Amino acid sequence: MIALIQRVSQARVTVDGRTTGEIGAGLLALVCAERGDTEAQAERLLAKLLSYRVFSDAEGRMNLPVQNMDGQGNAGGLLVVSQFTLAADTNSGTRPSFTPAAAPEDGRRLYDHFVTRARAAHPSVQTGEFGAMMQVSLTNDGPVTFWLRVPPAANA
């Protein structure tokens, strides 16, 4: 399972002109399930994402996670957006192949599991809409962007 995370000062996702999720300072996580992923990969990825230290401490070092982004126990927002294109195979030709991505029904199940677990573990979780054409706007803080991946069990 893959997450492209971006530290943001604000982010919003809309579908058909309707805002489905919006956060202030925190993380925007574009999330993708790969073939062979299970709930175990989703949970490992979420644990890594929530504890990944990308916010600055008092000395200006990236040393704080989204769950304690100000160093005083205050959590930042988490906006989770499904994006199957993260699994694209771009190794040959000029058109991406999405064969590595999970089938839509598996992707939805794993995305829903990821979001459910995120809401249980983090106080401020917003989402996009799985499978919808979305418009995502953000102000990247830094910019700070990281690629996190927990490989499918068969490829681990």
Curated annotation (Swiss-Prot):
Motif Gly-cisPro motif, important for rejection of L-amino acids: where in chain: 142-143
Keywords: Cytoplasm, Hydrolase, RNA-binding, tRNA-binding
Keyword Cytoplasm: yes
UniProt GO molecular function: D-tyrosyl-tRNA(Tyr) deacylase activity; Gly-tRNA(Ala) deacylase activity; Ser(Gly)-tRNA(Ala) hydrolase activity; tRNA binding
Entry-linked PANTHER family: D-AMINOACYL-TRNA DEACYLASE 1, D-TYROSYL-TRNA TYR DEACYLASE
HAMAP family named in the record: Deacylase_Dtd
Protein name: D-aminoacyl-tRNA deacylase
Species: Cupriavidus metallidurans (strain ATCC 43123 / DSM 2839 / NBRC 102507 / CH34)
Taxonomic lineage: Bacteria, Pseudomonadati, Pseudomonadota, Betaproteobacteria, Burkholderiales
